[in-house]
């Protein structure tokens, strides 16, 4: 590659209508379609703008990939099941199923069961 003077490069880009801006950032995150997140720590962020084109953003630096957090299932206790069964007047199995469907929300489970009667 030929050595290029940074000043000359800047002049050439200006003539072409390209503006370059460097930003400082502590962290940059990109959320991927798979749910994973690329985390750049102390990246160099370069924004290039050309006339009539959307800006191009370059992230330069090391990154890590974070896996998506798995939602933990709501903990359903026997006391919750008994309360729902008593309030809705249904069996323990029906009460447990309603609690699982409502994500452990007791009030929602009772309302669902009373609405089904």
UniProtKB/Swiss-Prot annotation:
Keywords from the UniProt entry: Protein transport, RNA-binding, Transport
Keyword S-adenosyl-L-methionine in the entry? The reply is: no
Quaternary structure note: Homodimer. Interacts with the ribosome. Binds ribosomal RNA.
GO process annotations (BP): protein transport
What NCBIfam families does the database record attribute to this sequence? archaeal-type nascent polypeptide-associated complex protein (TIGR00264)
Protein name, as recorded: Nascent polypeptide-associated complex protein
Give one Pfam hit by family name.
UBA_HYPK
Domain NAC-A/B, chain residue ranges per copy: 3-72
The beginning of the lineage is: Archaea, Thermoproteota, Thermoprotei, Desulfurococcales, Desulfurococcaceae
Any one GO molecular-function label of the UniProt entry = RNA binding
Per the record, the similarity remark reads: Belongs to the NAC-alpha family.
The function of this protein is:
Contacts the emerging nascent chain on the ribosome.
Q: Gene3D superfamilies, alphabetically?
A: DNA helicase RuvA subunit, C-terminal domain (1.10.8.10), Nascent polypeptide-associated complex domain (2.20.70.30)
Q: Which gene encodes it?
A: nac
- Please report the organism this UniProt entry assigns to the protein: Aeropyrum pernix (strain ATCC 700893 / DSM 11879 / JCM 9820 / NBRC 100138 / K1)
Q: PROSITE patterns given for it? A: NAC_AB
InterPro entries reported in the protein's UniProt record: NAC-like_UBA, NAC_A/B_dom_sf, NAC_arc, Nas_poly-pep-assoc_cplx_dom, UBA-like_sf
């Amino acid at each position: 590659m030929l050595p290029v003077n940074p000043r000359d490069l800047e002049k050439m880009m200006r003539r072409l209508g390209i503006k370059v801006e460097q930003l400082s950032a502590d962290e940059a995150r990109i959320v991927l379609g798979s749910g994973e997140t690329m985390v750049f720590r102390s990246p160099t962020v370069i924004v290039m703008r050309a006339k009539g084109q959307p800006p191009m953003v370059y992230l330069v630096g090391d990154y890590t990939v974070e896996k998506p957090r798995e939602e933990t299932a709501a903990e359903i206790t026997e006391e919750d099941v008994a309360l729902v069964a008593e309030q809705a007047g249904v069996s323990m199995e029906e009460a447990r199923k309603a609690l699982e469907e409502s994500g452990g929300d007791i009030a929602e489970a009772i309302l669902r069961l009373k609405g089904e009667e």
